[in-house]
């Protein structure tokens, strides 16, 4: 059995265990819910909104095996495409132990993602819920979520932070790129991950270097390893190790918070300029924003620095490496900006990077094709009717964004990397939602674009490179199989 077959077999075995475990713990539909399912089916046959067609698959495991098999292929959306042809763009299924309504319809997805918590709430696998905790920004609802999301979002969009991000990216990238060798490949995914984590750690809690950063990174690696682990918590299991790692990180962040409070005791609160997200949250008077809640959420917010941003950067370089015309135009655009700034003696500001039109089109097209976030899950809190479909109370809803982004209904030649398609196209449509949507739209989306813009600028203005052949792995998270090795030559 070759390596890929072994991996696939292990994945099947792994997820079947998860499904069986969920079944034992009552996550599988109860007899009462089965009756309700049948009631919905009968109702939809006679009048009113229809219950989506589809199949619940095999007993216990549902359609999980076929879903995982497709997820590991080079066309993960094939599972969805097959059912879309059979049942339509919205259909029922049963994956990972949960009865699920799956949508590949852009309008239905937008309607669900824009709904409030009376209709839909976030839904995550049991392991993720345990690791995040009930007070995570990913799970909380109502006024506390709006308050937290608003405070964090405003700061992440602020010109002050964007200027800091540019300075930090320049510093960390220069330190890294100065050490790159022409005699051995640079693992681009690892480099981008290291830089992005440093940038985010400073933006969140002002940890920049030294033992604090190294300790945080070590514990974070242990923590994030448990996100796709078995939901079994006892000494020796990955979930137990991950929970312990998070406890250690929370204690570290709480010490940082206590230090900040001590340093500002003798100052007027209004005179304290927020340098990071913790400062912003500490300045808020809400009694609900406890130090423990803040510390826990700082850990959760580090996940994009480990996954989303580095993957976006890596995929952009991968797609550009395979598209010489796009790479040449992006390089020309960035070299012109560099020459202009050298001529005037001005530094590069954050809005300089975001004003590069073709660079932004490349990032947008990378988001569409790369699908860093392949889908978003919600749970229906009541029966909800959308576009003629009824989504039953208690059912999971999966907005499968990847299928929408690669649908020829919305995009001509959807599997072709074509940044020029965005010259006349509006990004603010239901058919483009790489960061989710609604009240839970990722607050760091502007920073993701900015960090990618800065990275690409430094790369194309300092180096020429050849990328080795590599494969995009789409499950359980998007990443490059070999970390995208590139052979560089300095300009």
Swiss-Prot record:
Its cofactor is heme. GO terms for cellular component: endoplasmic reticulum membrane. This is 3-epi-6-deoxocathasterone 23-monooxygenase CYP90D1. Heme binds at residue 442. PROSITE patterns: CYTOCHROME_P450. Keywords: Brassinosteroid biosynthesis, Endoplasmic reticulum, Heme, Iron, Lipid biosynthesis, Lipid metabolism, Membrane, Metal-binding, Monooxygenase, Oxidoreductase, Steroid biosynthesis, Transmembrane, Transmembrane helix. It is a single-pass membrane protein. It is found in: Endoplasmic reticulum membrane. Involved in brassinosteroid (BR) biosynthesis. May convert teasterone (TE) to 3-dehydroteasterone (3DT, 3-DHT), or 6-deoxoteasterone (6-deoxoTE) to 3-dehydro-6-deoxoteasterone (6-deoxo3DT, 6-deoxo3DHT). It is an enzyme of class 1 (oxidoreductase). Expressed in leaf vascular tissue. SUPFAM superfamilies: Cytochrome P450. The chain crosses the membrane at residues 7-27. GO terms for biological process: brassinosteroid biosynthetic process; leaf development; petal development; stamen development. The lineage of its organism: Eukaryota, Viridiplantae, Streptophyta, Embryophyta, Tracheophyta. Belongs to the cytochrome P450 family. Pathway: Plant hormone biosynthesis; brassinosteroid biosynthesis. It comes from Arabidopsis thaliana. Disruption phenotype: No visible phenotype under normal growth conditions, but the double mutant plants cyp90c1 and cyp90d1 exhibit a characteristic brassinosteroid-deficient dwarf phenotype. GO terms for molecular function: 22alpha-hydroxysteroid 23-monooxygenase activity; heme binding; iron ion binding; oxidoreductase activity, acting on paired donors, with incorporation or reduction of molecular oxygen, NAD(P)H as one donor, and incorporation of one atom of oxygen.
């Amino acid at each position: 059995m070759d390596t890929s077959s072994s991996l696939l077999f292990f994945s099947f075995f792994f997820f079947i265990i998860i499904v069986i475990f969920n079944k034992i713990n009552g996550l599988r539909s109860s007899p009462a819910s089965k009756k309700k399912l049948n009631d919905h089916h009968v109702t939809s046959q006679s009048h009113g909104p229809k219950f989506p067609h589809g199949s619940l698959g095999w007993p216990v495991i549902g359609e999980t095996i076929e879903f995982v098999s497709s997820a590991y292929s080079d066309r993960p959306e094939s599972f969805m495409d097959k059912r879309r042809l059979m049942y339509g763009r919205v259909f029922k299924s049963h994956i990972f132990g949960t009865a699920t309504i799956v949508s590949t319809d852009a309008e239905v997805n937008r309607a669900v993602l824009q709904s409030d918590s009376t209709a839909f709430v976030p839904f995550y696998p049991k392991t993720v819920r345990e690791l995040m905790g009930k007070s995570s920004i990913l799970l909380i609802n109502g006024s506390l979520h709006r308050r937290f999301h608003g405070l964090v979002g405003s700061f992440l969009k602020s010109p002050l932070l964007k200027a800091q991000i540019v300075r930090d990216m320049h510093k960390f990238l220069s330190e890294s790129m100065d050490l790159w060798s022409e005699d051995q490949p640079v693992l681009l995914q690892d480099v981008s991950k290291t830089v992005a984590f440093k940038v985010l750690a400073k933006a969140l809690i002002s940890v920049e270097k030294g033992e604090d950063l190294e300790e945080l990174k070590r514990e974070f690696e242990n923590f994030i390893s448990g996100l796709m682990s078995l939901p079994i918590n006892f000494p020796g299991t990955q979930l137990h190790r991950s929970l312990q790692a998070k406890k250690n990180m929370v204690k570290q962040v709480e010490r940082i918070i206590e230090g900040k409070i001590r340093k500002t005791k003798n100052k007027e609160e209004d005179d304290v300029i927020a340098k990071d997200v913790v400062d912003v949250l500490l300045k808020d008077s809400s009694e609900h924003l406890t130090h423990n809640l803040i510390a826990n959420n700082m850990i959760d917010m580090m996940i994009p620095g480990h996954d989303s941003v580095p993957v976006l950067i890596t995929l952009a370089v991968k797609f550009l490496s395979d598209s010489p015309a796009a790479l040449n135009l992006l390089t020309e655009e960035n070299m012109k900006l560099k020459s202009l700034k050298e001529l005037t003696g001005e530094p590069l500001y954050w809005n300089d990077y975001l004003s590069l039109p073709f660079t932004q089109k490349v990032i947008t097209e990378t988001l569409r094709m790369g699908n860093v976030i392949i889908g978003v899950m919600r749970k229906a809190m009541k029966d909800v009717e959308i576009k003629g479909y009824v989504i039953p109370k208690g059912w999971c809803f999966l907005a499968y964004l990847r299928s929408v982004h690669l649908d020829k209904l919305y995009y001509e030649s959807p599997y072709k990397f074509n940044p020029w398609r965005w010259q006349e196209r509006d990004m603010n449509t239901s058919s483009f939602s790489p960061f989710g949507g609604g009240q839970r739209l990722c607050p760091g989306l502007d920073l993701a674009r900015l960090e990618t813009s800065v990275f690409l600028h430094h790369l194309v203005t300092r180096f020429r490179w050849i990328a080795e052949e590599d494969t995009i792995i789409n499950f359980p998270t998007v990443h490059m199989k070999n970390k995208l090795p590139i052979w560089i030559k300095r300009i």
